[in-house]
Each structure stands twice: as C-alpha cells, then as structure tokens.
C-alpha cells in the first residue's frame, strides 16, 4: 500500500503530508465517529507494521513528486492508532533528513506507557484526543480496548506535558447522540486546563462516521460546551473547527493511486474531487470506474456525498470486536 499521501489541507496543520503507518484497522479504540470505519483488530500491543526504511522511502518518493510544493508538516495520521508502531522514535529520527516539522495525531490511549511518552517527545507537534474524561461517556464514544484505564491515560498525558517542549494541541469531538451533563463538560474542561495545551480544538463530525446513528450536535449543545470551555480554560486557548479544510489537495501523475491513498484515511467530498479533477483535465469517469471496480465506495452523510477507499473496516458486516 501507499504509506505517504497528500499533502492534504488540514484545519490544524496547514498543508500536511500524511504518513499512514498503521494498516486498516489496528487500533486501541473503536470510536463511534471514526471516518475510517469500525476497528477490525482492537489491540494495545505495540509492534512493527512497516519497516522504518519503507516509511522513509515512501515519504522521500512522495516529496520527490511534489515539485517543491510547500509542506507544513509530515504527519503520522493512520488507518489505526499510530503509537502502536514500535519504531516511531527511529522513524522520526530518519525523517529529520527532510527538515520539515513532524506531527502525530494520536488518540492518547497508550500515553500511560513510558516508552510511548518517550517516543513522541521528539515530535514537533502532538495532538491528543480528549473527547471526555467522564468514564461513561468515554466508553460510549471511544469504545476502548478492555484493558485500558481512563485514569491512567489522563495521568500519562499530564506526565508527558511536564517533559514536552513542542506544541501540544487537543481535539474534543462533540456528538449529537451523546447526553452531555454539565458536570461531565466541566470535568473535561478542568482536565484540559490542567493539561495546559497550546490550543484546544472542538470538533463535530463532518464525514461519514463508522456508526450511522452518529449525527452532528445541535447548535445549543455546541454553544453550551463552548461557553464552559471558554470560562474554565480561556477563550484564547479554544478554537471551534469549521466545516471543511478546503480543496488544496495535491495530485501527482498517478491520480488513481493518490485518490486511494488519501481516501483510505480521509473521505473526500464529491465536489472537491470534481474540482481537483477539472484542474488536472481529468474526467470524473475515473471515479465511476474506480467505484465499479470496487476500489472506491460512495457514502452519504449530512446531505453530502463522499468517496472513500473500499477498506474492510467500512464493510457493514464487520462487527464490533
């Protein structure tokens, strides 16, 4: 498979060249809103998935095709949880050759482990998932591996922050199907205040989630959570993410390969694909062909059409592990 993809426009990281370092779908969580689909292999065991040399080569080849296109970050964002990769530290060391800042987007679930904390200290930017610090809501949203303990994860985040010199951000997903109590919102905000990241991002689902019952929250729910976060953490630290990143995706000469690499982790809206293909003077027929060949699937969410690589985690027959 293609490990490096993009760059893709990111609402947090600018132009991000993605590194899909975990196959579909090894993860410690099975989040109800995950755009990659349901977790097939729920695990907390770290191991090698790809060799560091293969990851380096894939990034090197991808950068070589971009004609000096600006890249803001090399970002470990995968079909699963990137800290499951036991070679993270070596990979970051090798990727320093490109002189581009390196980021990781993690669900935070393994941060209680000292080896994981040490491995990600060398990233320029670390993004932690903190959907809720309320035990019941955490289990309902993130559906964690049976051996994970929320308190240990939260303690691990604080321990990491005490030693980290880079930029730390957090992301909190707000869902329409969750009954947030004021107490649960306050608890999460108070934890984030203690964690003291550079920025706390609030997000809502904008792409097809793994579970069809997941809907965007009502505006009054967003407003309430935003008000509590602003009061406890401070307005300067909080940012509510907008609807979509934009359409500044980068294609190489192999458009089909690029579409499959991007949509493996990042479902693309139909209108964005059409615009990108038009810029490259390529007919939309290529998308219809990929759907007919079973390479892509067509999804609908919140009144919009998306296309995604046909991966096993999106199979409706996949059950929760």
UniProtKB/Swiss-Prot annotation:
Tell me the cofactor note. Binds 1 [4Fe-4S] cluster. The cluster is coordinated with 3 cysteines and an exchangeable S-adenosyl-L-methionine.
Q: Which domain of life is it from?
A: Archaea
Supply the InterPro entries for this chain: Aldolase_TIM, Elp3/MiaA/NifB-like_rSAM, GTPase_Obg, rSAM
The Radical SAM core domain sits at 11-236
Query: Has UniProt tagged this entry with the keyword Repressor?
Result: no
Looking up Gene3D superfamilies in the UniProt record yields: Aldolase class I
Q: Does the keyword Methyltransferase apply?
A: no
Enumerate the Pfam families for this protein.
Radical_SAM
Q: Which cofactor does it need?
A: [4Fe-4S] cluster
Residues that hold [4Fe-4S] cluster according to the record: 27, 31, 34
**MF terms in GO:** 4 iron, 4 sulfur cluster binding; catalytic activity; metal ion binding
**The entry's keywords:** 4Fe-4S, Iron, Iron-sulfur, Metal-binding, S-adenosyl-L-methionine
Family statement: Belongs to the UPF0026 family.
Q: What is the name of the protein in this document? A: UPF0026 protein MJ1312
| Species of the source | Methanocaldococcus jannaschii (strain ATCC 43067 / DSM 2661 / JAL-1 / JCM 10045 / NBRC 100440) (Methanococcus jannaschii)
Which lineage ranks, top first, belong to the organism behind this chain?
Archaea, Methanobacteriati, Methanobacteriota, Methanomada group, Methanococci
